[in-house]
Design a protein with these regions (language model features):
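Nucleotide/phosphate-binding catalytic cleft detector across ATP-hydrolyzing
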Residues: 1-177, 194-196, 205, 216-263, ...
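C-terminal structural cap/anchor segments
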Residues: 251, 255-326
């Protein structure tokens, strides 16, 4: 249940990466204080999202012999085979963030979802391994500790958004999540119950705002207001006679411009974002295997016409991703902007509910634990 919500401008971050420690720490503290005040409780630990184009995914496999004398597969065998899949070449400046099992194979029988309890001699696994830049990960954790909180778990922003807004049926059937943030866009492809591919695009809602500011010669604040109140991702649906008032740079001159002109600035950028996302789907080979279509979330999805643009580019159905499965302050945290944060709440709840160490080992692994211990010693 959601008890409190806090928001703060993400100063100190650029495209999901920390560029100023002090400003990032202050932003975390401001959001936390607001949430604590609303909830009437203190925050001790947090689940943190990792964003930025430094995160990407690759496929891997692992193979082990079943250890038990009766050849019944146990959780320890699953743990070993998942760990075996981690044996990939990773650059010294990168670290494994998540290892996501997709399917197991037992003595040649593939497509096994849960191998525990089955009988076999040879256990194989296909995994999706997500890595990130060590310094980027450490800087995020360092900021959270600097704000006075323990890090309970870490999740890539795209996976957290999926946890927040996707249904289990969509994940099973096949769906593409496009989470449009401020500086980046997360693209995650799901099929048969798991994440198959993750990518972070270097464009987001701030790029749309910047395009408007340049095209209309106005301030970024005015451009953001125009985008949210009058913007549209599909220019052709806007009446050519409709006007919007634009305050020019300097603040003295107000000019009436066609609203369609505003949409003609916005439209190409939104199409570009969806075309880049579609290319990521094509790379996976799942472009024809998305019966559940596309789910668009994030602050950038609040723009009018976004679903129409997504449907046009992907040539499939599209819906707006609202947080689901959370009780409490629904009106405060129901919008698509809360896709990642709502997913982090559910991520943390699942992590606590799982009393074994398997989920932590599978998702973030020993490298994260070493990073957290090092940062605790540092502080």
């Amino acid at each position: 249940m959601i008890l409190g919500v806090g928001e703060s401008p993400s100063e100190g971050l650029r495209k999901g990466v920390v560029v100023n420690l002090e400003k990032t720490i202050s932003a975390i503290q401001a959001a936390a204080v607001a949430a604590e005040r609303m909830a009437g409780q203190r925050i001790e630990s947090v689940v943190v999202s990792l964003g930025g184009t430094h995160t990407w995914s690759q496929n891997s496999t692992g193979v082990v012999a079943v250890a038990h004398p009766d050849h019944e597969i146990g959780e320890d065998d699953v743990h070993r085979v998942v760990e075996a899949s981690r044996a990939i070449s990773v650059a010294s400046d990168r670290q494994v963030i998540h290892v996501i099992p997709r399917a197991f194979t037992v003595d040649g029988q593939d497509g096994v979802r849960d191998a525990v309890g089955m009988t076999g001699h040879r256990l194989e696994v296909e995994t999706n391994i997500i890595t990130g830049a060590q310094t980027a990960v450490q800087n995020v954790i360092k900021c959270v500790h600097g704000a006075g909180f323990d890090v309970e778990d870490v999740a890539c922003a795209g996976l957290a958004a999926g946890e927040g807004v996707l249904t289990s049926q969509e994940i099973e059937l096949g769906v593409c999540l496009v989470e449009i943030g401020a500086g980046t866009t997360n693209v995650v492809v799901y099929n048969e119950g798991s994440a198959r591919h993750l990518a972070v695009l270097p464009v987001g809602g701030n790029h749309v705002t910047s395009d408007i500011a340049i095209g209309l010669r106005t301030t970024l604040d005015e451009a953001e207001s125009l985008k949210l109140n009058y913007g549209h991702a599909v220019p052709d649906v806007i009446d050519q006679a409709e006007k919007v008032e634009v305050r020019q740079v300097g603040g003295d001159r107000i000019q009436a411009l066609p609203r369609r002109f505003l949409a003609e600035i916005i439209g190409p950028r939104m199409v570009e974002i969806f075309q880049m996302a579609r290319e990521e789907v094509r790379k996976t080979g799942f472009d024809q295997l998305l019966p559940a279509g596309v789910v668009v979330a994030g602050g950038g999805s609040r723009l009018m016409g976004t679903m129409d643009a997504a449907q046009s580019v992907f040539n499939t159905s599209a819906r707006l991703g609202h947080p689901i499965g959370l009780a409490g302050l629904a009106d405060k945290a129901y919008g698509p902007s809360f896709a990642v944060s709502s997913g982090l709440v559910k991520w943390g709840a699942h992590s606590r509910a799982d009393h074994s160490d398997m989920r932590q080992a599978v998702t973030f692994g020993n490298t994260y634990q070493k990073t957290v211990r090092w940062l605790r010693d540092f502080f």
